[in-house]
């Protein structure tokens, strides 16, 4: 009986919650929550991605949404058991609303709800055709008018965007756009991806020669089609490019290559976009109801402007345009920046016999890849996690169940352990002059990524080259100007250079809205990315969720989708369900639409 005690606790709590919500007794429901509670909802109650922090916010949300949501049938998820450790009871849960089925995660403390995650799994009557409902494929029987699968796909490709319009247009065909389009395909939402490159996967292939994913394979699966079990831990850029190209074909995506989105505008009366694209040398006008910008966090380059750039006689380019090291053997290179791209490019240049200097203008968080995998990701995304029964879906939901408000409290001990383990490594870097940080509150890489999307390097070898002096370093300085053959730094140092690489990062995705739609719409939407943590590059006030990502924005029918492969996989589910509901005319009363505090 003892092993069933956690189940009994959770079942009793869920039963009480079910009864209170069904009866519309808000106070009774709210009393089931801890004072310092967190309820993170992915679409089910709020038609938004929203975290309620504390009882008052839970009460306010329920008061606004309960009548429309009609939640019921709360219980421990089928086939699951609750567990208990250190005074916290954990459980996977399931429930329904009037229009959907939900899945979630619960943490109980002292008999009350401490953290609650609710996510929309599917819309009733609009389930994905999987399992027993998978399509037959072959059509048995005799039919003189039979069309093959290939003929049907060719007909669809010829008609969509011409004789019939897509419901959704996705601008950007990297992993974000591809993952979302795959979800929408399964939900029967007519969708076209607009991609400027010649082939799917080119956004990876065309990056610098040495690029590999820094996240391990277990973290990077796409929806429906995980990587094979023999896939390398870290994917080389061309290999991941080929995988994305294959994925677009087998998932039957309508992917328009060599197509440039010229402009877009929204008609408030018809509630329809006009999207002008150029394809095969001719202009095509698309009329979707929904527009998704999946142009990527690493798509709009931040190109600095330094005095003398027009005088420099050597090669200079942003890291996104770096062709690789081959043509620079025996020459001198200066790389401005100290994050992932800067380190990768410096290491590749050194390997090719280039005299390379990194210019580090501000502190950078460094974490060794093996330490990150073992201590930071190992419990959720590793071969050990897989062998213990952890699935990608569960790992994603466990990560999602930690409210951003307190996530740093879970991350600080992780990075303290990494600092202790790799103390000698960090000492050698500091001795070489490298300026280190561990996040402004010591919470490390993940929080830095969520807050600002930059400021770190996952070390796969370049840090050792800096520590031993193979890669030269100038830190704590900025660029003053360029001359014909050199870079002059703010401390007066002159660095001779045949090549200057600006590894200076990328701008907000909001910039694409300004370019494609208008500055007015970009300002109306506001800054994209960040939590409002009031840390560097993430100004307050506190938002509690990523600004404008995967959820409704202040511009009707305009959405932003992107992030790393993990986020592209996980959040594509919830964005696709929001779009499907709107296509089907299902009411989607949005609660807590994000206010705009900062422009892009």
What are these language model-derived features?
Residues 1-35, 153-165:
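Short, low-complexity N-terminal intrinsically disordered segments enriched in polar/charged residues
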Residues 19, 23-85:
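A solvent-exposed, acidic/Ser-Thr-rich amphipathic alpha-helical stretch
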Residues 92-94, 98-156:
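Short beta-strand edge/turn micro-motifs at domain boundaries
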Residues 140-166, 317-330:
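A short, basic/flexible loop-to-alpha-helix module at the beginning of a structural domain
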Residues 158-193, 340-350:
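N-terminal Rossmann-like FAD-binding beta1-loop-alpha1 element of flavoenzymes
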Residues 166, 189, 194-196, 237-340, ...:
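Flavin (primarily FAD) cofactor-binding/catalytic cores of flavoenzymes
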Residues 176, 198-199, 341, 364:
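Conserved Rossmann-like nucleotide-cofactor binding loop
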Residues 205-242, 363-436:
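Glycine-rich active-site loop/strand segments that organize a redox cofactor
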């Amino acid at each position: 009986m003892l092993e069933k005690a956690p189940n009994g606790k959770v079942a009793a709590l869920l039963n009480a919650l079910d009864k209170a919500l069904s009866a519309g007794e808000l106070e009774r429901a709210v009393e089931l929550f801890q004072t310092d509670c967190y309820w993170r909802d992915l679409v089910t109650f709020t038609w938004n991605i929203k975290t309620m922090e504390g009882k008052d916010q839970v009460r306010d949300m329920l008061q606004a949404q309960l009548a429309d949501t009609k939640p019921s049938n709360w219980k421990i998820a089928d086939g699951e058991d609750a567990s208990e450790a250190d005074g916290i009871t954990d459980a996977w849960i399931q429930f329904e609303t009037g229009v959907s089925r939900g899945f979630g995660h619960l943490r109980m403390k002292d008999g009350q709800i401490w953290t609650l995650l609710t996510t929309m799994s599917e819309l009733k009557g609009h389930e994905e055709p999987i399992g027993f409902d998978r399509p037959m494929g072959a059509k048995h029987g005799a039919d003189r008018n039979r069309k093959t699968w290939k003929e049907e796909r060719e007909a669809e490709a010829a008609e969509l965007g011409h004789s019939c319009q897509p419901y959704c247009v996705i601008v950007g065909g990297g992993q974000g756009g591809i993952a979302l389009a795959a979800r929408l395909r399964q939900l029967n939402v007519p969708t076209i991806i607009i991609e400027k490159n010649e082939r799917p996967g080119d956004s990876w292939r065309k990056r610098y020669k040495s690029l590999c994913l820094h996240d391990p394979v277990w973290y990077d699966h796409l929806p429906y089609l995980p990587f094979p079990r023999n896939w390398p831990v870290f994917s080389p850029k061309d290999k991941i490019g080929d995988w994305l190209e294959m994925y677009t074909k087998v998932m039957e995506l309508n992917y328009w290559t060599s197509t440039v989105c010229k402009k877009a505008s929204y008609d408030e009366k018809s509630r329809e976009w006009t999207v002008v694209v150029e394809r095969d040398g001719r202009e095509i006008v698309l009329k979707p109801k929904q527009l998704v910008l999946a142009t990527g966090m690493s798509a709009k380059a931040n190109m600095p402007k330094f005095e003398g750039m027009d005088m420099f006689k050597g090669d200079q380019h942003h890291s996104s345009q770096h062709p690789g090291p081959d043509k620079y053997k025996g020459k001198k290179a200066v790389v401005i920046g100290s994050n992932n791209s800067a380190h990768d490019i410096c290491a590749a240049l050194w390997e090719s016999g280039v005299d390379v200097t990194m210019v580090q203008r501000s502190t950078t968080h460094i974490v060794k890849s093996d330490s990150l995998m073992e201590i930071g990701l190992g419990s959720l995304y590793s071969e050990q996690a897989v062998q213990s029964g952890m699935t990608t879906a569960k790992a994603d939901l466990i990560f999602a169940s930690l409210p951003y408000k307190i996530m740093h409290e879970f991350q600080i001990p992780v990075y303290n352990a990494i600092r202790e383990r790799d103390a000698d490594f960090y000492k050698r870097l500091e001795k070489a002059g490298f300026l280190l940080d561990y996040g402004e509150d010591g919470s490390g890489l993940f929080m830095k990524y969520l807050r600002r999307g930059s400021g770190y390097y996952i070390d796969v070898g370049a840090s050792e080259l800096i520590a031993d002096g193979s890669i030269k370093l100038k830190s704590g300085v900025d660029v003053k100007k360029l001359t014909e053959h050199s870079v002059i730094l703010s401390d007066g140092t002159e660095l001779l250079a045949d090549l200057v690489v600006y590894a200076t990062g990328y701008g907000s995705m909001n910039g694409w809205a300004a370019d494609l739609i208008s500055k007015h719409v970009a300002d109306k939407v506001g800054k994209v990315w960040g939590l409002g943590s009031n840390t560097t590059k993430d100004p307050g006030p506190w938002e509690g969720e990523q600004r404008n990502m995967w959820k409704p924005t202040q511009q009707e029918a305009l959405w932003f989708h992107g992030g790393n492969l993990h986020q592209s996989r996980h959040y594509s589910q919830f964005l696709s369900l929001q779009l499907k509901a709107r296509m089907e005319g299902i009411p989607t009363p949005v609660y807590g639409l994000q206010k705009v505090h900062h422009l892009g």
